[in-house]
């Protein structure tokens, strides 16, 4: 059975394609989600997408994933720099995750340089534009262990 991946996008990522295209590009979130699902399928994996501008809703979705997905790809948006709650949810469900940022947050304002997630992430993808989603999905599909593989250990 193929791996199951949850792709989470945080606040304002619903504006991809129109918000600051000089930073984030012109590809929409719907385009990112469709191409990510197609890429996952080409690798024998399934991918579910979720986007919310609300911290608690993201926490709820992460908790609902416990025991149901093999890996999470998360672009926490601005919550990267503020959300202990999302960090705790990710750690609490014990699902490996990739932290993803479309822009190079380290080349931007100093307050964007700190992440509450990076030290717990299995990997971090920064500054590759929306291509980073393809890289993240492929990494999870190819390199993460499935729930079945973990159970056999």
Swiss-Prot record:
Keywords: Lyase, Quinate metabolism. The active site is at residues 24, 101. GO terms for molecular function: 3-dehydroquinate dehydratase activity. Homododecamer. Adopts a ring-like structure, composed of an arrangement of two hexameric rings stacked on top of one another. HAMAP family: AroQ (MF_00169). Belongs to the type-II 3-dehydroquinase family. Substrate binds at residues 75, 81, 88, 102-103, 112. Is involved in the catabolism of quinate. Allows the utilization of quinate as carbon source via the beta-ketoadipate pathway. It comes from the Eukaryota. GO terms for biological process: 3,4-dihydroxybenzoate biosynthetic process; quinate catabolic process. The record marks 19 as: Transition state stabilizer. It comes from Aspergillus oryzae (strain ATCC 42149 / RIB 40) (Yellow koji mold). This is Catabolic 3-dehydroquinase. Pathway: Aromatic compound metabolism; 3,4-dihydroxybenzoate biosynthesis; 3,4-dihydroxybenzoate from 3-dehydroquinate: step 1/2. Its EC number is 4.2.1.10. NCBIfam families: aroQ, PRK05395.1-1, PRK05395.1-2, PRK05395.1-3, PRK05395.1-4. InterPro entries: DHquinase_II, DHquinase_II_CS, DHquinase_II_sf. It catalyses: 3-dehydroquinate = 3-dehydroshikimate + H2O.
